[in-house]
């Protein structure tokens, strides 16, 4: 049996996230499994590198699946390109080790949250960036981000309904950059809690607006109180950028 590794990108706007759910719920996984099953005549189960929430996008999402088919990789890529909707594209595919598992072999993930800080929202990036035109103190945001680097209990940076067994996570780096008014908050870590990156971005945005101070981020960490909904930025600004194995 073959084990095939795929790298894909998708616009998550109209989907209820990656993971397949009950019937008639639109998800990325369900779309891909449906097309692969039709192509191979098998009941294909796709293993994803992790869950992305409703409305979240991905630039380099990694998945794998097992099949007995003997189609070439080029044939399968062309088939997927033809039959998947325009907002999902499988960019690469290759035969890989039987032991490869897209989820369990992940060492770290990189997400980016984008904020359009220009005066007016953009017609062309409105689905991929959160618009906030209040003047931001980028230097203060960078100072605040330093408190989040390392291994911490991120209980204050997840939703009340999160049922994760452990809220300990390790963030390797947070890079904050600005290009033509688009603020990108890039976060790399060994794993993330429910809505964690969106809450981190929301907290850093509050620092940028000078509603709170950089040191308040450290206080939030130490308080270990689950975040209130006001800190959670909209899903559309979040994108899974890369996966490290």
Curated annotation (Swiss-Prot):
User: So where does substrate get bound?
Assistant: 111
Q: Name one GO biological process term.
A: tRNA pseudouridine synthesis
- So where does this one cross the membrane? none
Q: Entry's CDD domains?
A: PseudoU_synth_EcTruA
Q: Which residues form the active site?
A: 53 (nucleophile)
Q: Which reaction does it catalyse?
A: uridine(38/39/40) in tRNA = pseudouridine(38/39/40) in tRNA
Top-tier EC class: isomerase
Annotated signal sequence is none
Q: Which UniProt keywords apply?
A: Isomerase, tRNA processing
Q: Which GO terms describe its molecular function?
A: RNA binding; tRNA pseudouridine(38-40) synthase activity
**UniProt cross-references to Pfam families, sorted A to Z:** PseudoU_synth_1
InterPro entries cross-referenced by the UniProt entry: PsdUridine_synth_cat_dom_sf, PsdUridine_synth_TruA, PsdUridine_synth_TruA_a/b_dom, PsdUridine_synth_TruA_C, TruA/RsuA/RluB/E/F_N
Gene3D superfamilies named among the record's database cross-references: Pseudouridine synthase I, catalytic domain, C-terminal subdomain, Pseudouridine synthase I, catalytic domain, N-terminal subdomain
> What EC identifiers does the entry list?
5.4.99.12
Superkingdom of origin organism: Bacteria
Q: How does it assemble?
A: Homodimer.
Q: What does this protein do?
A: Formation of pseudouridine at positions 38, 39 and 40 in the anticodon stem and loop of transfer RNAs.
Protein family per UniProt: Belongs to the tRNA pseudouridine synthase TruA family.
Among NCBIfam families, the record links this protein to: hisT_truA
Q: What name goes with this protein?
A: tRNA pseudouridine synthase A 1
Question: Origin organism of this chain?
Answer: Clostridium tetani (strain Massachusetts / E88)
Starting at the broadest rank, the lineage of the source organism is:
Bacteria, Bacillati, Bacillota, Clostridia, Eubacteriales
> Gene name on record?
truA1
């Amino acid at each position: 049996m073959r084990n095939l590794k795929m790298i894909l990108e998708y616009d998550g706007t109209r989907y209820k996230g990656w993971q397949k759910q009950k019937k008639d719920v639109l998800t990325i996984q369900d779309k891909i499994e449906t097309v692969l099953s039709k192509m191979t005549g098998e009941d294909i189960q796709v293993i994803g590198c992790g869950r992305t929430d409703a409305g979240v996008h991905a630039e380099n999402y990694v998945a794998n699946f097992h099949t007995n088919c003997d189609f070439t990789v080029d044939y399968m890529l062309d088939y997927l390109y033809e039959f998947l909707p325009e907002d999902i594209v499988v960019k690469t595919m290759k035969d890989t080790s039987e032991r490869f598992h897209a989820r369990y072999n992940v060492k770290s993930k990189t997400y980016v949250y984008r904020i359009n800080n220009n005066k007016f929202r953009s017609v062309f990036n409105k689905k991929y960036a959160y618009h906030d035109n209040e003047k931001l103190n980028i230097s203060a945001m960078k100072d605040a981000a330093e408190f989040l680097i390392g291994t911490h209990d991120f209980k204050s940076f997840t939703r009340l309904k999160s049922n994760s067994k452990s809220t300990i996570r390790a963030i390797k780096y947070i890079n904050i950059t600005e290009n033509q008014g688009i603020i990108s908050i890039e976060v790399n870590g060994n794993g993330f809690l429910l809505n964690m990156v969106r809450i981190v971005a929301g907290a850093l945005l509050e620092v940028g607006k000078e509603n709170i101070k950089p040191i308040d981020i450290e206080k939030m960490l130490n308080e270990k109180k689950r975040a209130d909904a006001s800190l959670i930025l909209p899903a559309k600004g979040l994108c899974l950028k890369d996966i490290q194995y």
